[in-house]
Amino acid sequence: MFTREVKETVLKRFPTIELSYDKLIHNKVYADLFMIIPKGPKAFLWFTYIENKNVAILLLLNKQGNVKSLDIYPICFEDNLSLGTLMYGTFFDINSYHHFSCEDIFTYKGRYVNNNRLNEKLKIYERIFKNEILQKSYNKNFVIVGMPLWTSSYMNAINTIPTLPYKVYAIKSYNMRDKNGRSLGINLYKEKVKLEAVFKVKASIESDVYNLYCSDNQLYNVAAISSYKQSIMLNSIFRKIKENI
């Protein structure tokens, strides 16, 4: 935990940046790269120094984009990142282990890179995650820093989401030809909820009519019989008919 004095000193050195918010996409846009964004609070991850120590500071943001808390977290990284590397992304947990998913980068070793083309940023990410950050957690205090999952099509992103070990907030779209490297916007992801229920089933006098009852014996509805095969199966369970014997 920071003392009030140290916190104020650290925030005075925080880079002056303009945080742009992604617009919601309602219509089809031309994009050739898609980022799957995890669900969780937004945060900055700042590799810097305090006195003579190189540190990684996680700054959690509120919904207005203001810093609501900051803490030092153990992360395996090369010291030269502390020349001033600032990432923006999502903080979330998987099986009680902390993760930070880097969606954007503002400064890299003291150099402002946020206006770089997307392909230039991707090269920086590759350098960082190949050589300068070790994605390892020695205990549950550590933060594992990584990239969101990228796909080349929107449908690939949609089909991939159910296989991920974390909840998803949105899909962010990019056009590699854009010079400023910024996203075209995001599509919020709505998780499909599968509803399951157990009913009491009672056969009606009419053929292929089965009434469904709740646990308090209140009638809910009538079961749908969509095929002859289902009709035979339900008859064999709930009725005694010679043709089914």
Per-range role (PLM):
Residues 89-90, 101, 110, 116-137, ...:
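Eukaryotic endomembrane system proteins
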Residues 15-65, 92-95, 108, 130-245:
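Nucleic-acid 5′ end/cap handling module spanning
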Residues 80-83, 99, 165:
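A short, structural micro-pattern
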Residues 1-14, 23:
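Hydrophobic, proline/glycine-rich low-complexity stretches
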Residues 98-101, 105:
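Elongated alpha-helical scaffolds
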